[in-house]
Amino acid sequence: MVLLARADRSLLNDAVTVLAACLMTLVVAAAGTHGGTRSPPDLPGLTWLPGADRARPWLLTALLLAYFAGTVLYVKTMIRDRGDGRRYALSVAYHVVVCLPAAVVNPWLGLLFVALALRSAVVPKWWPGITPAAIGAGEIAASITLGALLLLT
């Protein structure tokens, strides 16, 4: 079907994939606590969401989602949608918005997210021809930094 051509590269497809991957944090948290689920007090006998009784897995999931959703926007701005002013503005705006919540959780996370916001604003303008390999290397470095900070959070 023509409408679905290249749908595997759509923003919606990427967002759903990122959401599913980030939700695995909750699955792992539940598995690491022998199920980690319990019934809500007002609904005895029903299994609740993994980690529903603990805030940390949800916090980690939210932070991972914030980072990887921004990555989708940034990479699309740099490769598939290079030169698209609306996609660029969306990417920069998104990155700026997530800085404050990240900083509230941990100032070091806030600093990382500020650096990512600056990157989303500066790199597409100053280095529009940067190679996909260089973009990927930057994402690897940012992911490792995020992972280290999340372990300390």
Q: Predicted segments — roles?
A:
Residues 1-19, 78-92, 121-141:
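Interhelical loop and helix-boundary elements at the membrane-water interface
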Residues 1-2, 21-24, 64-73, 114-125:
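Alpha-helical transmembrane segments and their membrane-interface exit regions
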Residues 7, 50-54, 67:
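Alpha-helix N-cap/loop-to-helix boundary motif
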Residues 14, 61-64, 110-113, 140-143:
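Residues within membrane-spanning alpha-helices of integral membrane proteins
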Residues 16-30, 87-102, 137-153:
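Small-residue-rich segments of transmembrane alpha-helices in multi-pass membrane proteins
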Residues 23-59, 100-109, 148-153:
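Helix-coil boundary and interhelical linker segments in multi-pass alpha-helical membrane proteins
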Residues 63-101:
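Active-site rim beta-loop-alpha module in soluble metabolic enzymes
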Residues 90-125:
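Transmembrane helix-loop-helix
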